[in-house]
Regions:
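Bacterial N-terminal signal peptides
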Residues: 7-18
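A well-structured
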Residues: 56-58, 64-67, 73-98, 107-111, ...
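Amphipathic alpha-helical packing elements
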Residues: 33-70
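Bacterial N-terminal signal peptides that target proteins for export
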Residues: 1-7
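Bacterial Sec signal peptide processing site at the extreme N-terminus
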Residues: 16-41
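Pan-zinc metallopeptidase signature
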Residues: 250-354
Length: 354
């Protein structure tokens, strides 16, 4: 029996247990992922093929180099994950819907049989995402729909007893980025295989962000494959440092607005006044960015600020960064040793799930 048939039969049983309300969502998730896997090509075969463009070969060699480094030097799981490649033919892999109450900075959560509760809901089809977002708006929620360039199965389908067909692939969206961002994205997705806490998106994403940041730094310092980079290694790392400085400035703006918004929502004033003050805060946030945008060195957030901002946008920034410093401190406490650090993170994860 073909591998995809086995998965479909397994998912079919889950659909029956999950009930009709989620059937459409799980079906699009399964069929979308299987459609992606059906297009996966082995990276080694692509590198050996005369039909593969030199540009793609260069990027795939960099992927192989990073993957080997993080497995050997950092101790990330050694499995069949990220040994295949998928050309998506578009600049995103899924569209993600997020939601929040209009007068509360608390993300709406969706609970899944395979991953616990998360603060987002992903769709492979953009129209499906916008249709679902419209349904959520009818519940008088703040809603946003954003493109996502990467996702992983958290290592669940990279098991040695499963056919390589199921393993997570490298996506063409990784390769559309600068080398520093490509390296960071790959490390981030591989880090999700180390630990995953049900119902705690901030823990999972902040952990992966820290691992990507430190992993990128170590790779650029210690890698001997300097011929794989676009430009020299020092320039790549300096670009990444500049990008991190830009992200910190952006986060400072968002965090300031976030804190002020919490005060407004907690105040003993009418909901109508709260909504008015909320819009005033977003207006001031845009003004603040306009006055400081020349301070950004390599990144621009102009498109982000062109959106009709709501609570989901503030929460989205918090989701990926709120606990990064905590993991950085833990790494130092473990003498910057990856095995000890990962063990300590697993202990934290186990404690939080009790």
């Amino acid at each position: 029996m073909r591998a995809w048939t086995v998965l479909l039969l397994s998912l079919g049983a889950v659909f029956i247990l999950s009930g009709c309300s989620d059937l459409g969502f799980y079906w699009q998730a399964a069929s979308g992922h299987l459609g992606l896997l059906n297009r996966k090509q082995d990276i080694r075969e692509l590198l050996n093929s005369p039909e593969t463009s030199p540009e793609l070969k260069q990027k795939l060699k960099l992927v192989e180099s990073v993957r080997t480094f993080v497995i050997v030097e950092m101790g990330l799981p050694d499995n069949e994950g990220y040994t295949g490649y998928v050309d998506l033919g578009r600049p995103y892999v899924t569209m993600v819907v997020t939601a929040a109450p209009p007068l509360e900075l608390k993300a709406y959560q969706w609970c899944y049989w395979f991953a616990g509760c998360q603060e987002y809901r992903g769709y492979f089809d953009e129209n499906d995402a916008h249709s679902y977002a419209a349904e959520m708006k009818q519940q008088e929620l703040d809603v946003s729909v954003e493109p996502v360039t990467a996702y992983s199965t958290l290592g669940w389908l990279n098991k040695p007893w499963l056919p390589n067909y199921f393993s997570d692939p490298v996506l063409s969206t990784f390769l559309l980025q600068r080398d520093a961002e490509l390296i960071a994205a790959l490390i981030h997705e591989m880090a999700h295989q180390v630990v995953y806490v049900n119902n705690d998106t901030a823990f999972n994403e902040s952990f992966a962000v820290f691992v990507e940041q430190e992993g990128l730094r170590q790779y650029l310092i210690h890698s001997e494959n300097t011929d794989l980079f676009e430009g020299n290694r020092e320039n790549i790392y300096q670009w990444y440092l500049s990008a991190e400085k830009d992200r910190r400035l952006f986060r400072q703006m968002i965090n300031t607005t976030f804190d002020k918004m919490k005060i407004i929502f907690a105040a003993e004033i009418s909901d109508e006044v709260k909504l008015q003050k909320k819009e005033e805060l977003f207006y001031k946030l845009r003004e603040n960015y306009d006055s400081q945008k020349n301070e950004f060195q390599v990144l621009s957030y102009g498109n982000w600020f062109k959106q009709k901002l709501n609570n989901t946008h503030l929460l989205g920034v918090q989701r990926y960064q709120s606990r990064v410093e905590e993991f950085a401190l833990l790494f130092e406490e473990q003498q910057r040793k990856w095995p000890q650090f990962f063990d300590a993170v697993r202990e934290l994860a186990n404690a939080s799930e009790k």
